[in-house]
């Protein structure tokens, strides 16, 4: 019985210690934690500045104290964004970045962000798979090839060859959506060059000079 209890306790201890290690192995999580710590340092500095100003006789309504408060608040917004982003894995980011590239890579930041947000809306909707990979590989929706490492590598190889930054630009749009920076109703679940679902939330026209299209973002 004693051996059984010891073994059980060891298993529990391993489980507790392995969770942070699993997260730490994910570079996105590690980067987000570092960014959060940086923002908290900024908050500490802003707080200390405000306190120092108050001791010197400045009121809370003074421009200097207000500037310190603004800095603290902006850091808090950034922390909230990084906390949301930290919930996604490297694989989630890679798959969605590849998807955004193929769906709207050479359009505008707005369109790229909207495409990413539609996918994230689907992840949160019970009618669709609850993972980024599941949404992208769902039959009849996007494309299973978007979920492959090879597809992402091909984009980056082209960037390296041509001196372009298409993958990075698409990744920025994906992270903006994951951080909650894209304004779109949660029930916008469709994106295509035609209207569908329960009506159009917004249509966006794009003309590159050699290619023109209208994208419809629709309620589901």
Task: Name every feature range the model reports, one short phrase each.
Residues 73-84:
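Signal peptide-directed extracytoplasmic domains
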């Amino acid at each position: 019985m004693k051996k059984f209890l010891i073994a059980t306790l060891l298993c529990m201890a391993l489980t507790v210690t392995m969770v942070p290690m699993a997260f730490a192995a994910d570079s996105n999580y590690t980067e987000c934690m570092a960014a959060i710590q940086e923002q908290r340092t900024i908050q500490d500095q802003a707080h200390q500045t405000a306190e120092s100003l108050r001791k010197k006789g400045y009121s809370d309504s003074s421009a200097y104290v207000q500037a310190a408060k603004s800095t603290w608040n902006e850091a808090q917004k950034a922390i909230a964004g990084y906390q949301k982003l930290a919930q996604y894995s490297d694989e989630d980011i890679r798959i969605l970045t590849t998807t955004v590239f193929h769906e709207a890579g050479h359009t505008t930041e707005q369109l790229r962000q909207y495409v990413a947000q539609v996918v994230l809306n689907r992840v949160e909707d019970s009618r669709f798979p609850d993972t980024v990979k599941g949404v992208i590989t769902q039959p009849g929706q996007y494309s299973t090839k978007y979920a492959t490492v090879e597809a992402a590598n091909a984009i980056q190889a082209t960037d390296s060859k041509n001196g372009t930054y298409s993958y990075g630009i698409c990744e920025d749009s994906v992270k903006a959506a994951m951080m909650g920076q894209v304004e779109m109703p949660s029930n916008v679940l469709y994106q295509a060059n035609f209207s569908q679902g329960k009506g159009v939330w917004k249509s966006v026209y794009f003309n590159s000079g050699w290619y023109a299209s209208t994208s419809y973002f629709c309620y589901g």
